[in-house]
Amino acid sequence: MARLLAAFLSGSILAALTPFVAQAQAPAPSGSLPEGPGKEMVQGACTGCHQTNEILRSSGYTREGWKELTSTMIDLSASPAESDQLTEYLATHFPPNDKRQPKLMPGDTHVAFREWKTPTLGQRSRDPVQAMDGSIWWAGQWANLIGRIDPTTGEMKEYALPPNAMPHTVVLDDAGHVWYTGNKNGTVGKLDPNTGKITEFKMPDPKAKDPHTAVFDRKGILFFTLQLSNMIGRLDPATGAIKLVTMKTADARPYGIKVDADGFLWVACNGAPCLVKIGPSTLDLTEVKLPTPGTTVRRLDIAEDGMIWYVNSGKGKIGRYNPKTGEIKEWGSPSGPQSHPYAIAVVDGIVWYNESGQRPDALVRFDPITERFQSWPIPSGGVHAGIIRHMRPTRDGDLLIHQSSTNRIIQVTPSNRAAVR
């Protein structure tokens, strides 16, 4: 083992890991791995980016499953002996289990999943969005890049970003530029796909450290959340001017953001039981208090009828807020209070979201008229290890999702898309 550990510390495995460990924040240690051959290697190869509890609480895999999962993060092809010992340790101590199995609900809708595996290992591909030409853009947060897929050919291209940008999301403007949030360097950036030129817009306040989720309004103004900074931002692309406003509630942690039909912004609070309505010109904030203590909201979406749908991540529910009447109604997610609903999208009156606390991550369909749920396990290559952190519809009514742990971008096509019920 001493020889193997020395090989890890000085050799190819460390070289494979270096770009990602250097850019990822070191997680706080938690839990302890069982003793056995390969423990030191797992500690070195895995816990540079992941908390130990992520391994301890995993759904477990066969030897082949662990090999596939680790291959999405580090390249061990030049070190087969070390690769074998790594996967053997993980398979021995963390075999398949059903500790976090979702409660899958049957129904009449069928869905097809189409997957793309992004090129750079360990990038945590996320937040895919469709461009006007049908291409798909994504953020490779941990590898400091954004990428493009041509769904017709499968060809992919990745664009390196300025140092330590660590993009949290991507959005597109009407001119075809790709905008990203620099979550670790306090910037918003714009990529011109035709030239490859990147323009950075730095936050005017040093306290504004982490641009998070972004959305354009109908006037072409970019609005964005800053979760840990507890702020909302507005950027005028024509002038580069940025205005910031602090949330009314301390540690509200603004997360998801959407625009309603009247041009108002709506923000989800990931640290408090609230939704926030924002005036686009004044940035005046109006809080909507949600009734259940312990409620936290990762994301929200707005239906065509103006209803605000949100995930109650902290309580394992989805909810609906009527802005005209103030009525709030919530439904428990099928897998229960620990299911942690995360991303959400409303398409043709149907609510789609995921249960990120389960393994496999479950894609859930909810019909507000019948109040019935249906759900599916989300594929992630040959394993079920990822979670969706954001979902957005295509122009045809499909869903674009991802599995960040395995670098998968996925397009979901419901069979009865044309007749939604």
What residues fall within each predicted segment?
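Electrostatic cytochrome c docking/interface patches
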Residues: 22-41
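The canonical Cys-X-X-Cys-His
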Residues: 42-52, 86, 90
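C-terminal capping alpha-helices of c-type cytochrome domains
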Residues: 75-102, 134, 397-399
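Beta-rich, blade/repeat-based domains predominating
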Residues: 121-133, 163-175, 206-219, 250-264, ...
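Conserved beta-strand positions in repeat-built beta-propeller and related beta-rich domains
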Residues: 137-142, 178-184, 222-228, 265-271, ...
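Short loop/turn segments that connect beta-strands within beta-propeller blades
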Residues: 150-154, 192-196, 236-240, 279-283, ...
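Blade-level signature of beta-propeller repeat domains, shared across WD40, Kelch, NHL, RCC1
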Residues: 385-421
